[in-house]
Amino acid sequence: MSRTEASGWGFSLLQILLVLAGMVWKAREGFPIVDFLDTSGDTCSWLNPCIVPPALSCWNNWPWFALHLFLYTTQLVGLSAIILPPVYLIRMLGLSTALPLISLWVLHRRRRTGKGWATTFPPRHGEEAFLWRVLWFTGLAHVASFLVATAASFLGREDMAPWHLTNTLLGTPDCSYLPCSQIAERQARLRQINEMTGTSSGFFLAVALFSQHLEMNGARLGAGLLARLFFVSLIAGPAAGAADALLLRSAFMRTRRST
């Protein structure tokens, strides 16, 4: 097995682990693995109404869920703009399961079609400028969300409780005793599952594409570069980390063409 194939299987194993983590997490929280649209109101598809909650629920509960909804939506929009194809699989399985499965399809496309990973998402005109916009937009949104939640946590006032880290970005509020809707709490829990597993999958897919392209050209993804990508993802969010990985891939391709 070549180094490129070994790396591909390693990233594939990571995507499988993310699939299993998302499915187990959803099952433990009482969510169906397959999200057939349910209009009963006590459960929800990951896409609707979890991203666009019903107007009344949003109006009554917005202080408790607005910050995480903003963070999740900006990350999802960024990843969708970069790598997420509009297939029905996403709608049925949810981001936490479908994106790792799509990532597996992308990573093994070469074995089925003979096309390299670099051709899966070939550079397009204006791609770098677009990726820079995604990186800055999603990165600033991610940092701003954590700054707001951190400030609310340090202030410690009761009126700031809806913005506290434990009620927004590190967890969801316990609406069994807090003044918020338990239906909205379940929607927030599903968004949290999708964020932790689905958006992580998108980031690792972008890193895998960059790594495979390097190895196909006789280079490799070193520890320093990998640490830089993780640092960007940790601080600026997985969408910004994915954009950064694809920007590095474009820079490497441009350098190869000029030499």
From Swiss-Prot:
Could you list the residue ranges that cross the membrane?
5-25, 64-84, 87-107, 134-154, 221-241
Keywords from the UniProt entry: Membrane, Transmembrane, Transmembrane helix
Q: Which residues form the signal peptide?
A: none
**What is the protein's membrane topology class?**
Multi-pass membrane protein
GO CC annotations on file: membrane
- Per the record, the domain of life is Eukaryota
Where it sits in the cell: the answer is: Membrane
Give a short account of what the protein does. Answer: Part of the gene cluster that mediates the biosynthesis of paspalitrems, indole-diterpene (IDT) mycotoxins that are potent tremorgens in mammals. The geranylgeranyl diphosphate (GGPP) synthase idtG is proposed to catalyze the first step in IDT biosynthesis via catalysis of a series of iterative condensations of isopentenyl diphosphate (IPP) with dimethylallyl diphosphate (DMAPP), geranyl diphosphate (GPP), and farnesyl diphosphate (FPP), to form GGPP. Condensation of indole-3-glycerol phosphate with GGPP by the prenyltransferase idtC then forms 3-geranylgeranylindole (3-GGI).
Family the entry assigns: Belongs to the ltmS family.
What is the protein's given name? Indole-diterpene biosynthesis cluster protein S
Gene that specifies this protein: idtS
